[in-house]
């Protein structure tokens, strides 16, 4: 949240600005929106089964592993400096609804923190996050193939990082090449 708030305030991001069409957004934006909608479906199912711990773990994994460690880390240069071009606007219009949806999804688990987060995100809104509807699942933006390809990229990256640690090769030291054998086309 603090990353988003800092740059959104500097750039004067307006959530009501005309949305960049999903088809024109970069693949990483479409991936995180797809994953968010998968999360919405899974968290709602966990809540319906009274599996609060499961819902919390799903939200935590999404925020830590996918939003923070992948989306923000890989896309942070899109938020830095320069004018508000389509790419930067797309990044804001992707991260903003992700944060709002997470605040809504996690509100039953962390009521006070999520209420503060929601009210900080949705400026001018005086209604508590507990009075607004849970985010709706949108099947039209879910791309399971894209989610699977990104999961594969994440696994490959994790393995490379583990090998670097084992060989004591600093992550700042570029590798001339890395070969990843592929046994199956999937």
Map each language-model feature to its residues.
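Phosphate/ATP-binding catalytic cores across multiple sugar-kinase/actin-like superfamilies
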Residues: 163
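Short helix-adjacent coil turns
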Residues: 47-54
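Acidic, turn-prone loop/beta-hairpin segments
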Residues: 11-44, 73-159, 167, 173-184
């Amino acid at each position: 949240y603090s990353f988003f708030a800092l740059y959104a305030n500097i750039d004067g991001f307006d959530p009501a600005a005309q949305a960049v069409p999903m088809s024109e957004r970069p693949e990483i934006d479409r991936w995180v929106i797809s994953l968010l909608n998968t999360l919405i479906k899974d968290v709602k199912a966990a809540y319906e089964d009274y599996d609060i711990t499961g819902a919390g773990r799903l939200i935590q994994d999404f925020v830590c592993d996918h939003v923070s460690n992948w989306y923000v880390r890989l896309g942070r240069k899109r938020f830095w400096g320069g004018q508000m071009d389509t790419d930067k606007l797309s990044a804001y219009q992707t991260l903003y609804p992700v944060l709002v949806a997470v605040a809504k999804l996690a509100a039953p688990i962390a009521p006070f923190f999520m209420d503060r987060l929601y009210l900080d995100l949705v400026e001018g809104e005086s209604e508590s996050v507990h009075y607004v509807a849970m985010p709706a699942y949108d099947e039209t933006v879910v791309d399971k193939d894209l989610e699977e390809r990104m999961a594969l990229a994440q696994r490959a990256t994790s393995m490379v990082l583990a090998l670097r640690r084992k060989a004591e090769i600093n992550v700042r030291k570029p590798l001339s090449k890395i070969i990843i054998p592929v046994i199956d086309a999937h």
